[in-house]
């Protein structure tokens, strides 16, 4: 058990942590009072332990390998058992998959070393601001992620890692050279787990992980949370980030907002400013969810002054609830942003900022004359909504948009990929008139969107925002 740091010549020196397996299996004295009461122990037969880590989606494929060959070989070489959550089953509030490793101490370290190496091999296209595929928002990640390790541990293990007065975590940092942080501990409500974030160079992280695994080994309760899916977990879940709100955003507003940011193609827009005014009137969970969404949009380069949010509290609550309940979170994001924009337009809100900055404008704003949301300087002034009507059987909406010939390629994408992805994402059918077939008297092509009201609204929103972006960068 690590003791408190001792004073030597005016400097604090952490007590070294012995990496050899401890002889005693008794519960260490510094375990916090919040430790779970479960009887389940960490070890199985033959000294087996468990390590749960988060893996960025871009690294999962290289860890699994073609047909699962890599992960099978890794298990064979190390003797460990490795389980990953499903491809779209992310840890709440992130786009990272959960990996559970079972094995000896040596196996845990070996497997994690392999995983860390794959995380460091971030593909060039992943580091770009705009995702390679708009159906995979998780491909846009923080470049600093390659220098991080994220480990999920039960509360009891977290207490051992921290140590009395923070002595143990300080010793881990001093001995490894890595920076170690734990997700915030909430007041009142106990979380079953907390997330440990280790940041540093490869060798520093390797050493820190070894020391953390030793603490896992010491805690007889560290095998109490072996789930890899959080889809059905009730109650609060720890935030994957070491600072800020203690709880993860289980309503999926954060990843869906990130998805929408990539879909719209916005990158490196005007600087972000404070936005307390748009949050007035919101409280509780709504405020947390909206703040998370806005923070995510800000991190993706949106100028929050140009959002023009005029959404009422009642409308926001409904939109957020719909997003949380959606089976397709990316589509929910598009609908959520569209709801913000159209509600703002209906209430007469206008986008702030100067001409040339882009707003998350209303769907009806394809022409400045419709509602003035974009203003006279809008690059979409050349586009127009030709009409909205019901399909012949009355079950679907049909929306027609006029798009300048030179901007049609932005909607089509290479080989029609963007158009296909928009359709898959929203569930709407999108058709573009053939080359040379223009709206009479113009050089505009006709885009026809067919689907449910929500689907057509989302598709129309994505198309108009993509056009706005493309016009602005040309």
UniProtKB/Swiss-Prot annotation:
Keywords in alphabetical order, please. Answer: mRNA processing, mRNA splicing, Neurogenesis, Nucleus, Repeat, RNA-binding
Checking InterPro entries in the record gives: KH-I_NOVA_rpt1, KH-I_NOVA_rpt2, KH-I_NOVA_rpt3, KH_dom, KH_dom_type_1, KH_dom_type_1_sf
Residue span, KH domain: 48-115, 146-212, 396-463
Span(s) of short sequence motif Bipartite nuclear localization signal = 26-42
Q: Name one Pfam family in it.
A: KH_1
Biased amino acid composition, Polar residues = 1-12
- Could you tell me which CDD domains the record lists for this protein? KH-I_NOVA_rpt1 (cd22435), KH-I_NOVA_rpt2 (cd22436), KH-I_NOVA_rpt3 (cd09031)
Note down the stretches annotated as region Required for RNA binding: 394-474
GO CC terms in record: cytoplasm; nucleus
Its subcellular locations are: Nucleus
MF annotations from Gene Ontology: mRNA 3'-UTR binding; mRNA binding; RNA binding; sequence-specific mRNA binding
Q: Where is this region: Disordered?
A: 1-43
PROSITE patterns linked: KH_TYPE_1
The record's Gene Ontology biological-process terms are: mRNA splicing, via spliceosome; negative regulation of cold-induced thermogenesis; regulation of alternative mRNA splicing, via spliceosome; regulation of mRNA processing; regulation of RNA metabolic process; spinal cord development
Q: How does it assemble?
A: Interacts with PTBP2; the interaction is direct.
What domain comment accompanies this record?
The KH domain consists of approximately 70 amino acids and includes a conserved hydrophobic core, an invariant Gly-X-X-Gly motif, and an additional variable segment. The third KH domain (KH3) binds a hairpin RNA loop containing the 5'-UCAY-3' motif on targeted molecules. RNA binding by KH3 requires residues C-terminal to the KH domain.
Q: Per its database record, what is this protein's job? A: Functions to regulate alternative splicing in neurons by binding pre-mRNA in a sequence-specific manner to activate exon inclusion or exclusion. It binds specifically to the sequences 5'-YCAY-3' and regulates splicing in only a subset of regulated exons. Binding to an exonic 5'-YCAY-3' cluster changes the protein complexes assembled on pre-mRNA, blocking U1 snRNP binding and exon inclusion, whereas binding to an intronic 5'-YCAY-3' cluster enhances spliceosome assembly and exon inclusion.
The molecule here is called RNA-binding protein Nova-1
Q: Origin organism of this chain?
A: Rattus norvegicus (Rat)
Q: Could you read off the lineage of the organism from its UniProt record?
A: Eukaryota, Metazoa, Chordata, Craniata, Vertebrata
Identify the coding gene.
Nova1
């Amino acid at each position: 058990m690590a003791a408190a740091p001792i004073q030597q010549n005016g400097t604090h020196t952490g007590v070294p942590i012995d990496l050899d397996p401890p002889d005693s299996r008794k519960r260490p004295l510094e375990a916090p009072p919040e430790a779970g009461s479960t009887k389940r122990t960490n070890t199985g037969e033959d000294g087996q332990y468990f390590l749960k880590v988060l893996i960025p989606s871009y690294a999962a494929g290289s860890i699994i390998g073609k047909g699962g060959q890599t992960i099978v070989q890794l298990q064979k070489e190390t003797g460990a058992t490795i389980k990953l959550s499903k491809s779209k089953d992310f840890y709440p509030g992130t786009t990272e998959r959960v990996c559970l490793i079972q094995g000896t101490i040596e196996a845990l370290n070996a497997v994690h070393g392999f995983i860390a190496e794959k995380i460091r091999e971030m593909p060039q296209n992943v580091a770009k601001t705009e995702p390679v595929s708009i159906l995979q928002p998780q491909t846009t990640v923080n470049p600093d992620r390659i220098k991080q390790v994220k480990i999920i541990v039960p509360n009891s293990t977290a207490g051992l890692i921290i140590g009395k007065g923070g002595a143990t975590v300080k010793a881990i940092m001093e001995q490894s050279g890595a920076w170690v942080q734990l997700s915030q501990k909430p007041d009142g409500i106990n979380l079953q787990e907390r997330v440990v974030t280790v940041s540093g160079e490869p060798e520093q992280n390797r050493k820190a992980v070894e020391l953390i695994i030793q603490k896992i080994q010491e805690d007889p309760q560290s095998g109490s949370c072996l789930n890899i899916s959080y889809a059905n977990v009730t109650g609060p879940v720890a935030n994957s980030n070491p600072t800020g709100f203690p709880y993860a955003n289980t309503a999926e507003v954060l990843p869906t907002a990130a998805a929408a940011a990539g879909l719209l193609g916005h990158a490196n827009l005007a600087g972000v400013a404070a936005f307390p005014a748009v949050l007035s009137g919101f409280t509780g969970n709504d405020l947390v969810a909206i703040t998370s969404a806005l923070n995510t949009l800000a991190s993706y380069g949106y100028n929050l002054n140009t959002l023009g949010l005029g959404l009422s509290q009642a409308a926001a609550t409904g939109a957020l609830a719909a997003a949380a309940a959606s089976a397709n979170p990316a589509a929910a994001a598009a609908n959520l942003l569209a709801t913000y924009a159209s509600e703002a337009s209906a209430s007469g809100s206008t986008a702030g900022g100067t001409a040339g900055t882009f707003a998350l404008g209303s769907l009806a704003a394809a022409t400045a004359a419709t509602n003035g949301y974009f203003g006279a300087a809008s690059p979409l002034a050349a586009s127009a909504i030709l009409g909205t009507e019901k399909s012949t059987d009355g079950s679907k909406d049909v929306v027609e948009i006029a798009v300048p010939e030179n901007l049609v390629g932005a909607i089509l994408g290479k080989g029609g990929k963007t158009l296909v992805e928009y359709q898959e994402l929203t569930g709407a059918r999108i058709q573009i008139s053939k080359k040379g077939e223009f709206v009479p008297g113009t050089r505009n092509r006709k885009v026809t969107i067919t689907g449910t009201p929500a689907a057509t609204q989302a598709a129309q929103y994505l198309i108009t925002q993509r056009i706005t972006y493309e016009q602005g960068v040309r």
